[in-house]
Amino acid sequence: MKLKKPYDLIVVGGGHAGVEAALISAQKHCSVLLVTMDKKAIGRMSCNPAIGGLAKGQMVREIDMLGGVMGPLADRSGLQFKILNRSKGRSVWSPRAQIDKRQYESIVMKTIINENIETIVGEAVELLIKNYKIMGVVLRDGSKIKSKSVILTCGTFLSGKIHIGDRKILAGRMGEENSDGITESLGVNTGKLKTGTPPRLDRNSVDWNRTAPTWGDDAPTPLSYQTREFNPPNDPCHTVRTNKLVHQIVGDNLDKSPMFTGDIAGTGPRYCPS
């Protein structure tokens, strides 16, 4: 593998954090290499295709004030925008956007290319360290890439595991391999966080007449302070309710749930952090 002179920065992982780290560094005229296990997955939205929400909306705007791109890119790919908690005081209002996830990752990739950030497909398994100083990374195939600094934004992929009922899959995300090795090379104690992911439904299989549509704001507010022209669509979300049959199905299958079998012992967050 032939790569140019040592980079100023290597970013490991191409999710939201990795994209922000790579872009802001490139804008500061650093030479940046983004290491990802799948170029098509850069900027991919794993779970609920939304940006913002309670607490997270404030974080998006803080990123925006620091020169980040999540806000403006979300404004360009949003399907519905809404300020949550309007029934309460303004201090707890929070912006949220439902996103076209495919359009979002497409815009992210174009932005990466426009900033001349180099990308390489590979799995970083070890840090190069000399005299307590970072010197680069080692890839799974043995390649060594040198840099002045490294930022790890591996997210759920580090020794990731997925539970589906009583099945367990080693994966960073559904359909994508996890990453092993670099965690051990860090020499620090690590822990795991858990989150639950909703099932995906084929929209053509849903009787929408039996659902209640919920709309975004009539006068939508962009997530980014950088956004000037803003006329997004207002696609509805749909609310459904459970019934006794659903409760019975859940109750009859609790013995297959990792939350109840002891396979997962952690308590999930009240509001999903993804």
Kindly label every feature range from the protein language model.
Residues D8, M135, K148:
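Conserved acidic residues
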Residues K2-L3, K144:
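Short, flexible hinge/linker loops that cap or flank conserved catalytic cores
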Residues P6, L23-K130, D141, S149, ...:
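Conserved N-terminal/central alpha/beta ligand/cofactor-binding core
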Residues L3-A17:
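Beta1/beta-strand and adjacent pyrophosphate-binding region of the FAD-binding site
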Residues N253-S274:
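Active-site helix-to-loop segments that bind/position phosphate- or nucleotide-bearing substrates
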